[in-house]
Amino acid sequence: MLQALTFFRGPQTWVLKSPQHSEQLPALTATFPDATVAFTHRDPVAVIQSTVTMMAYADRLRRTSIDPDWLINYWTDRIHRLLSAGVRDRDLVPAERSIDISFHQLNGNEITILESLYERAGVELTPGVRKSFERYLGSNPRGKHGSIRYDLQRHFGVSPEEVRSRFDFYFDRFDVRPEVGVRSGEN
């Protein structure tokens, strides 16, 4: 699809923000062999608790009942499949065309990481683009609109440690720090 769009619209640099690409690296690298890929890494427990909470809120709007067990099981399995494929296939993208960005490195260090990403991709980070990013970051601090309190145990009947135990392979491969359930159950 992207090749078809590029054909009609002329050559462009595509920026795709989706962790699902980690599950499709063989197809991505075969289709776009010169792609630069930024791999973002975060505690899967934080991702899962956010996803299942969001889905539960959405389900309240369109369903008469919610199945918390189904939500936690489905999304834990889904994220496990995605990350398993990403770990298995990560080396398909050579170091000179990829960068790994851990969530704990990103917060408060966005511009430095942005510079690294632009450099790796061979794209000029112009002063205007840098200023736009700085303006966006200044206007949108983390927690600007408040925060959501998560409680996997209470809402979904599973502890962060139970969920995390399925992802040792991911923590072993990448620089990922636990965010959930590591300080007296706080997120």
Which sequence ranges carry the predicted segments?
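PAPS-dependent sulfotransferases, especially Golgi type II membrane carbohydrate sulfotransferases
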Residues: 2, 9-14, 51-100, 104-187
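Active-site-proximal structural scaffolding
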Residues: 18-21, 30-33, 40, 79, ...
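Conserved phosphate-donor/acceptor-positioning beta-strand/loop module used by diverse small-molecule
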Residues: 17, 28-53
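Flexible loop/turn segments at secondary-structure boundaries
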Residues: 21-25, 45-48, 107-110
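Flexible, glycine/threonine-enriched loop-and-boundary segments that flank and lead into catalytic domains
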Residues: 6-34
